[in-house]
Regions:
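Short beta-strand elements in bilobed, periplasmic/extracellular small-molecule ligand-binding domains
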Residues: 101-111, 204, 221-251
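An alpha-beta-alpha
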Residues: 188-229, 341-356
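Flexible loop/turn connectors
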Residues: 256-365
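Short, solvent-exposed amphipathic alpha-helices that sit
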Residues: 11, 88-102, 186-189, 211-231, ...
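Hydrophobic alpha-helical segments within soluble ligand-binding/sensing domains
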Residues: 167-169, 174-204, 214, 248-255, ...
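N-terminal helix-turn-helix DNA-binding module of bacterial transcription factors
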Residues: 1-72
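Periplasmic-binding protein-like
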Residues: 79, 131-140, 201-207, 261-271, ...
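Alpha-helical recognition/docking segments in bacterial nutrient-uptake
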Residues: 7, 11, 25, 43-46, ...
Length: 365
């Protein structure tokens, strides 16, 4: 079977980590690839901060050592439980993998397929596989799952970092380290941008089937208050077109009616896949984006590929995985320190401005 680019990158990182420094030509020979391919790989990995590169020579970053001369991450086994290995969490996993490789640790992955009742067994499987600490993104879809299937996380016998999930204030889970995107900030960025373009209170079209969707909804209500806006019509419930065609059509019709009646000229849509399909269906009904409706997508997996490239809020998913892994390695290398304060890190999304809200150039806010 042909080696994937990710597997080749792992081998390249292992070679540099083992040797400390190496020339690009030497790496090409050891990897069995052309010098051009090796150079491209090195540039990519150096751009991600995983390697240092100077004049054809590659070195392992000196800053990877633990502060104070303590144990490094070399040889650590880290576990990662994710609800999915695709779409949103693919980038989170990639960031975690890169950070683990940089630390000299090995990352072991388990996927729950959004079955929260299996989270505990899969996490115990990670521990049985040798994980010394775990990154956990439970398969919760809402607060009821968190209440029913969450308490065990606080009882794990190893350092644990919660990924892209928030705990109920005051609960045992609230005492865990966690790293998550600040979706409230992302919603605020989107609404401020639409208001700056002269639109009245934008509508929200959003799902209800994930913690991200619920965080976007909560962030919308909070942003309205922050911006001093009157609450418009209720949030339009969106569903995937392939899962519920009738529900999807109801959402499109509700947005169509709001636009054609003059009640709304701007909307934020979660997520970008739904946004692309909604824009296509609106066009069939005679509503044009951005001429009749300024639209921003929440999430930026495929937003740039739409016929009219969509302005999008981009959660920092790769950085979430990276920072969470670095935090876990820090906990493991520092040893048991009961005085070490637990951290709740909220990483800020960016707004990538494209054509769907009336802009003509691509930029990030």
């Amino acid at each position: 079977m042909r080696e994937s680019a990710a597997e080749r990158h792992d081998r390249l990182l292992a070679l540099v980590r083992e040797r400390g420094t190496a020339r690009v030509a030497e790496l090409a020979e050891r990897l069995g690839v052309s010098p051009v391919t090796a150079r491209r790989d090195v540039e990519l990995l150096a751009g991600r901060g995983l390697l240092d590169r100077v004049h054809g020579q590659v070195s392992w970053p000196e800053r990877r050592g633990a502060p104070g001369g303590g144990r490094t991450g070399e040889g650590l086994v880290l576990g990662l439980l994710a609800p999915s290995a695709t779409y949103y969490f693919a980038e989170v996993i990639r960031g975690a993998h890169e950070a683990a490789a940089r630390a000299g640790a090995r990352l072991v992955l388990r996927v729950s397929d959004y079955r929260p009742e299996e989270d505990r067994a899969r996490t115990e499987g990670l521990l049985a596989a040798g994980a010394e600490g775990v990154l956990v993104a439970p398969g919760w879809r809402g607060p009821e799952d968190r209440r029913a299937y969450g308490d065990w996380l606080a009882e794990l016998p190893v350092p644990t970092v919660l990924l892209e999930r928030r705990a109920e204030p005051g609960s045992p889970l609230d005492g865990l380290d966690r790293v998550a995107s600040d979706h409230g900030h992302g919603v605020l960025l989107a609404l401020r941008h639409l208001l700056a373009l002269g639109h009245a209170t934008p509508l929200l079209v959003a799902r209800r089937d994930s913690p991200t969707a619920l965080a976007v909804r909560a962030g919308y209500a909070e942003a309205l208050g922050t911006l001093g806006l009157a609450e418009p019509r209720p949030v339009i419930d969106s569903v995937p077109a392939e899962a519920d065609p009738e529900g999807f059509e109801r959402a499109v019709r509700a947005l169509h009616d709001a636009v054609t009646s003059g009640l709304a000229g701007a909307a934020l849509v979660h997520n970008d896949v739904d946004a692309i399909e909604i824009v296509q269906r609106l066009a069939e009904l005679g509503v044009r984006v951005p001429q009749d409706l300024a639209l921003i997508a929440y999430d930026d997996e495929v937003a740039a590929l739409a016929d009219t490239p969509l302005t999008a809020v981009a959660p920092p998913k790769r950085q979430v995985g990276r920072h969470a892994t670095e935090l876990l390695v820090e906990r493991l290398t520092e040893g048991a320190d009961e005085d070490a304060a637990r951290r709740h890190l909220g990483l800020l999304p960016r707004l990538r401005v494209r054509d769907s809200c009336g802009a003509r150039t691509t930029s990030s806010v």
